[in-house]
From Swiss-Prot:
PROSITE patterns, per database record: KRAB, SCAN_BOX, ZINC_FINGER_C2H2_1, ZINC_FINGER_C2H2_2
GO biological process: regulation of transcription by RNA polymerase II
KW Repressor (keyword) present: no
PANTHER family referenced in this protein's UniProt entry, alphabetically: ZINC FINGER AND SCAN DOMAIN-CONTAINING (PTHR23226), ZINC FINGER PROTEIN 18 (PTHR23226:SF190)
Positions of the KRAB domain: 211-283
CDD domains hit by this protein: KRAB_A-box (cd07765), SCAN (cd07936)
Domain of life: Eukaryota
Recorded GO CC terms: nucleus
Functional description taken from the UniProt entry: May be involved in transcriptional regulation.
Name assigned to this protein: Zinc finger protein 18
Zn finger (C2H2-type) location: 408-430, 436-458, 464-486, 492-514, 520-542
InterPro entries linked to this entry: KRAB, KRAB_dom_sf, SCAN_dom, SCAN_sf, Znf_C2H2_sf, Znf_C2H2_type
Source species of the chain: Homo sapiens
Length: 549
């Protein structure tokens, strides 16, 4: 039965006392280390089931970690609810904002909201924090992941030099740009020196980004930021996130990805500053909402399973989506191409899952082309078809092996079908399964349409009326055959005697006159007949029946 939340929270202090009595001396030492709420929260959320411990011991350990985090003996019910609401609010934030807000250690949901809203007015703080993460990720991450969040702790202030990130400066416009010189405080000089001593790998990857031709968008001073209108601020915000994506990929934080040869050139003007960017990575787009969200873990802190990019459009997981934060502050998400819109040619390729190989639009197979390779569905000879279309690999240029696609096949008789629904319906003929049974004569039918037609024989309903004579019919097929009498239409013409027929069945029977085909054979004497009615009459002679007495 459901338990009231207030009652459940009211039981926490008593359970905590019962568990405290079982704590050992080693648990007391552990409790001192878990004094930080953030550390206790991470231990609780990252706790995994231990097979060796068993379910009872695992539940006991999980309860202890929950008490360490929520502290029911100290916090009230309202405070515990506030902690849970704050955690959930931080979890649903976009990844870049989430990491920054967590580092500020907000004490309530209102404080977290204030921090998020402050980023819209001054994104420079988030930009500088991102720069610190990229430049000193190996060294500074240890300090940023310290178990306790002290009130007086201030992160070092860094301004990023574009040359050090392997990105070229853009030409400055009317609004003079701030020079991005790395200003280090005394307590971070040694740390960044150590980070630079690893170099080669980091610096080599950063210099390689010079091919992108991207320039770091500078952090505008407050007076310059206030002069921008809403559109320019949104452009500034998007370009900042785009540059952040290049920094992250250049610093080796994002997961590896196959090389893309397509290049998109675009220029944007912001506050008199012209930025010309050459990208080797396509800008985030989505095609008809069919492209699923790509998830990327930047590993900037040890939070488990952080989904950093919640935007609906991603470009193969390399660059964080420009709309990941823009969509958070605004209602629309630009960059999505709907139906009927022209997509850039660089984004027309279909990428195979897990291989990074691409297919050109010409290699997509339409249903019509696919049907030309399908075997006869009722031949029973073939259940696997091979498509002869070969797709070439983007890197090696070697043709792939032909792609096999299995068709639904009946295990009883071996018939092959195009769709699973056809196979399921066919299997009823073997099992004798019937879905629709007449309540009057108890006759059963497989199809609902046949069942409806049969019911009309009992009710006398004839909903299909002839427009010429007003005669009624129970179904449309009978009406169509009748209308051909009025129109004189005889679509089935014998190629031998040129006699025409209204119905196909009559045409087929007539053809047996010319071909001499006799498909109906008597099981007693072996005599064959062209029509089933002739066979019925003949069989009565063997049985000695006289139908007319």
């Amino acid at each position: 039965m459901p338990v009231d939340l207030g009652q459940a929270l009211g039981l926490l202090p008593s359970l905590a006392k019962a568990e405290d009595s079982q704590f050992s001396e080693s648990d007391a030492a552990l409790q001192e280390e878990l004094s930080s709420p953030e550390t206790a929260r991470q231990l609780f959320r990252q706790f995994r089931y231990q097979v060796m411990s068993g379910p009872h011991e695992t539940l006991k350990q999980l309860r202890k970690l929950c008490f360490q985090w929520l502290q029911p003996e100290v916090h009230t019910k309202e405070q515990i609810l506030e902690i849970l609401m704050l955690e959930q609010f931080l979890t649903i934030l976009p990844g870049e904002i989430q990491m920054w807000v967590r580092k500020q250690c907000p004490g309530s949901g209102e404080e977290a909201v204030t921090l998020v809203e402050s980023l819209k007015g001054d994104p420079q703080r988030l930009w500088q924090w991102i720069s610190i993460q990229v430049l000193g990720q190996d060294i500074l991450s240890e300090k940023m992941e310290s178990p306790s969040c002290q009130v007086g702790e201030v992160e070092p202030h860094l301004e990023v030099v574009p040359q050090e990130l392997g990105l070229e400066n853009s030409s400055s416009g009317p609004g003079e740009l701030l020079s991005h010189i790395v200003k280090e405080e005394s307590d971070t000089e040694a740390e960044l020196a150590l980070a630079a001593s690893q170099p080669a790998r980091l610096e080599e990857r950063l210099i390689r980004d010079q091919d992108l031709g991207a320039s770091l968008l500078p952090a505008a001073p407050q007076e310059q930021w206030r002069q921008l209108d809403s559109t320019q601020k949104e452009q500034y915000w998007d370009l900042m996130l785009e540059t952040y994506g290049k920094m992250v990929s250049g610093a080796g934080i994002s997961h590896p990805k196959s090389d893309l040869t397509n290049s998109i050139e675009f220029g944007e003007e912001l506050a008199g500053i012209y930025l010309h960017v050459n990208e080797k990575i396509p800008r985030p787009t989505c095609i008809g909402d069919r492209q699923e969200n790509d998830k990327e873990n930047l590993n900037l802190e040890n939070h488990r399973d952080q989904e950093l990019l919640h935007a609906s459009c991603q470009a193969s997981g390399e660059v964080p989506s420009q709309a990941s934060l823009r969509g958070f502050f605004t209602e629309d998400e630009p960059g999505c191409f709907g139906e009927g819109e022209n997509l850039p040619e660089a984004l027309q390729n279909i990428q195979d899952e897990g291989t990074g190989e691409q297919l050109s639009p010409q290699e997509r197979i339409s249903e019509k082309q696919l049907g030309q390779h399908l075997p006869n569905p009722h031949s029973g000879e073939m259940s696997t078809m091979w498509l002869e279309e070969k797709r070439e690999t983007s890197q090696k240029g070697q043709p792939r092996a032909p792609m096999a696609q299995k068709l639904p096949t009946c295990r009883e008789c071996g018939k092959t079908f195009y769709r699973n629904s056809q196979l399921i319906f066919h299997q009823r003929t073997h099992t004798g399964e019937t879905y629709f049974q007449c309540t009057i004569c108890k006759k059963a039918f497989l199809r609902s349409s046949d069942f409806v037609k049969h019911q009309r024989t009992h009710t006398g309903e004839k909903p299909c009326k002839c427009d010429y004579c007003g005669k009624g019919f129970s179904d449309f097929s009978g009406l169509r055959h009748h209308e051909k009498i009025h129109t004189g239409e005889k679509p089935y013409k014998c190629p031998i005697c040129e006699k025409s027929f209204i119905q196909r069945s009559n045409f087929n029977r007539h053809q047996r006159v010319h071909t001499g085909e006799k498909p109906y054979k008597c099981s007693h004497c072996g005599k064959s007949f062209s029509w089933s009615s002739s066979l019925d009459k003949h069989q009565r002679s063997h049985l000695g029946k006289k139908p007319f007495q």
